[in-house]
Amino acid sequence: MNYVISHLEMFGMGMDLFGLRELPGEENNPIIMQFFREIGHNYVQGDETAWCSAFINYIAKVNGYEYSGALNARSWLKTGTEVMIPNVGDVVVLWRESKDSWKGHVGLYVNQVGSYVNVLGGNQNNSVNISVYPLSRVLGYRVLKKI
């Protein structure tokens, strides 16, 4: 099967960071803390802060793509252009707790297998990895443009 990869630089950087983890206890992973600083959230004091959006913002910004700048995952629903059929590397936004909640999760689309979607993201079990989510949790897919 052939795949089209959107945002190749972003996806590649995400894969380069695969396995990056929060540090236990009082320590903070300096790379995760850099995600926050790079997008102007210098006030964040620890890697225990939800960082899925900071991760996507960071890899988008440093690779020259538009980015939300916000730490709320659902901010990505207003960034980029909505697409109905995603390519590898497109942004995927999911709901968390409930569809009507303000809470969410954001990552990069890898693929769909049956009624599940594989997502490359940060803060997935406290690390950068590929995790599986029910397709029913997807709020939308976004393609970003170079800036």
Regions found by a protein language model. Name each.
Residues 3-8, 65-129:
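...with weaker cross-activation on analogous glycine-rich loops/strands in unrelated enzymes
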Residues 1-63:
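N-terminal capping segments
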